[in-house]
Amino acid sequence: MKMKYFHHPSGLLPRLLLLLLLTMGAVACTKEDNPDQPTSDEVATVKMSLDDVEMRGGDLYSGEDLIKKVRIFVFREGLNGLWVLDKQKLFASGQSDFQNPFTISAHAGPRQIYVIANEPDALTTKLDKILFKKELEDMQAPDVNEPIVRPFTMTGMATATLNPQGTVQANISLNRIAAKITLDIKQVTPGSDVIKITKVQILRNAKNSRLLEGTNKPTGYWNWANACDLPLTNNGSAQSIIQASAPLYVYENIGSDSDSSGRATQLVVEALYNGIKTRYYAYVNDKTTTANHHYSIRRNHHYKLDGTITKMGEFSSLLLTTTVLPWTVENLDYGFLVPYVAEINPHAVITQDNVVTFENSLSFTVRIKGRDGSRWKATLDNGLEFGFDSGSAIDGAADGTTVYTIKVKALKPNGIGIQRRTNLFFTVDGKKVILDKNINPQPTDIKIIQQGL
């Protein structure tokens, strides 16, 4: 007799049956193997706090990056060490529960928790169908043939033991899937040599990457090129080719010294040296750096390239220094500037609760300093009950010299027994402005209240 098989059109049926068997096995073994653990058929709640994520004007940000979606996976260990899905949930901007920390309920017991922020739209359907941790670990981010653009996908992981007797708190640090590259070049040559940069390339940027951080090598590459007409000044200041305000964002490219010749990311500079065409080559993050991952690029890091042309030639005539920094580290020598208030009047608005009413606004003047050419923006974190009064500046040049007047008012009449609060802060390039560098901890928010009647 010929056997008949039922084929589910989604291909999920065999995986669902396997998941059911593994889950039943995990439940049966829980008390026998771990008598002190809460039973896994009990429901518990965990609050996931995303580090360095804050609400600004009703939106969630991690540093300068806007977060629009957060997906949480909770996995439990099944038979033979296979981690299976216990619960997953997608949080989206605009929903009432889209706030940090995020709350999710799952079954009690030891759990591994993964967070995906700003998931690519192309992966949403695949992520919806995840049943095993291995599927998530193997998932590839979308292929690219050009720089990665914001909003960046971010991922993080934590472990926690969920207990039905109380809400468990867990913290997760998010890592961006991208790395960033900046490049400055200067000339230090004998005599009166004249050099003009005509083209710069960053070769062998990874075309693909795992969604989660891993050790896999790229299977394809793309090249970045920028034609330019940039004269250098001998023994003068460096010229920014890839500026700090507009870095090159790429996937991680992980490997080793042994495979560097066909895989490692490479810098190529084309120039006219006293009118003669020449070309310079150098590996990004080679053995001369102090990093622990030579010839590789890792996600959530900043690769600051400083090149010095010393003479005509190819490899040895371009001295390239790669400084590897965490994404959020500021380097003041490189022109990164933590924005700050150059002057605020009256200064007391920084240190006190500033009272406003429906009729009378808070008014003060401010000068803000950021990097050259940058602009500041003012934000109230309670825009439903407070706003900027007429004549108030809400953005401006962060040049440190222009004086702006800020006016904040209450949008509603004073209520009986109702106290309303908001924080006012300024940002430059997504970074909060420090109000006074001499106060520890350095303040960034101005507190404003409306008293109740």
Swiss-Prot record:
Pfam families: P_gingi_FimA. Belongs to the bacteroidetes fimbrillin superfamily. FimA/Mfa1 family. The name (major fimbrium subunit) does not indicate the abundance of the protein, but is derived from the greater length of the major fimbriae. In strain ATCC 33277 and strain ATCC BAA-1703 / FDC 381, major fimbriae are 300 - 1600 nM in length and about 5 nm in diameter. In contrast, minor fimbriae are only about 80 - 120 nm long. This length difference is observed only in a small number of strains, including strain ATCC 33277 and strain ATCC BAA-1703 / FDC 381, and is due to a loss of function mutation in FimB, a protein that restricts fimbrial length in other strains. Residues 29-56 form a propeptide. GO terms for biological process: cell-cell adhesion. PROSITE patterns: PROKAR_LIPOPROTEIN. It comes from Porphyromonas gingivalis (strain ATCC 33277 / DSM 20709 / CIP 103683 / JCM 12257 / NCTC 11834 / 2561). This is Major fimbrium subunit FimC. The keyword Membrane applies.
